[in-house]
Amino acid sequence: MLALFNKLLDWFKALFWKEEMELTLVGLQYSGKTTFVNVIASGQFNEDMIPTVGFNMRKITKGNVTIKLWDIGGQPRFRSMWERYCRGVSAIVYMVDAADQDKIEASKNELHNLLDKAQLQGIPVLVLGNKRDIPGALDEKELIERMNLSAIQDREICCYSISCKEKDNIDITLQWLIQHSKSRRS
């Protein structure tokens, strides 16, 4: 009975209260950041993506939550911009190409360098290991170990293994993001 009441209350709140959140999506080039944005916005996977030059901003509405998503280029010349776009956001989404093991060390270093910035302290981080559909891609446990995520103690950190191409775990990723739009307001 209580569950039914809570669902009814959530439905009622959704009619009158809209939630907004701001996210920044960063990670090395070719990890699938822009593809991820397109998949959550339209449900469509496009094989022919052009690397982001600088940044893109997109607003996506899911239920009563509007997500303002900053997609920042991952090439070395754009990485100095990451901190600026991560300040004050609801969460940082860090994309990793889980199938490109040669870049895992560089990806780990960039993530830890970013999170060492004082102005980003306490902002939750969602690490997404993309391209799990490719044989040999790291799973969540391997990503946590290779990215040294257990060393990050000053904030909430979560890691999912996803495939934008197959839309694997996109639903739980969205649930995590929406949950964090609610937790930032309270």
UniProtKB/Swiss-Prot annotation:
User: Which intramembrane segments does UniProt give?
Assistant: 1-19
Q: Which NCBIfam families is this protein grouped with?
A: small_GTP
For this protein, the record's CDD domains field holds: Arl10_like
Where does this polypeptide localize? Late endosome membrane; Lysosome membrane
Q: What is this protein called?
A: ADP-ribosylation factor-like protein 8A
- Residues the entry annotates as binding GTP: 29-35, 71-75, 130-133
- SUPFAM superfamilies, per the entry: P-loop containing nucleoside triphosphate hydrolases
Single GO molecular function: GTPase activity
Which Pfam family, any one, appears in the UniProt record? Arf
SMART domains membership: ARF (SM00177), RAB (SM00175), SAR (SM00178)
Q: What does the protein in this record do?
A: May play a role in lysosomes motility. Alternatively, may play a role in chromosome segregation.
A Gene Ontology biological process in which this protein takes part is:
chromosome segregation
Its GO CC terms? late endosome membrane; lysosomal membrane
Give the family, as the similarity comment puts it.
Answer: Belongs to the small GTPase superfamily. Arf family.
The record's keywords, sorted A to Z, are: Cell cycle, Cell division, Chromosome partition, Endosome, GTP-binding, Lysosome, Membrane, Mitosis, Nucleotide-binding
Please, which domain of life does this record's source organism belong to? Eukaryota
InterPro entries found in the cross-reference section: Arl8a/8b (IPR044154), P-loop_NTPase (IPR027417), Small_GTP-bd (IPR005225), Small_GTPase_ARF/SAR (IPR006689)
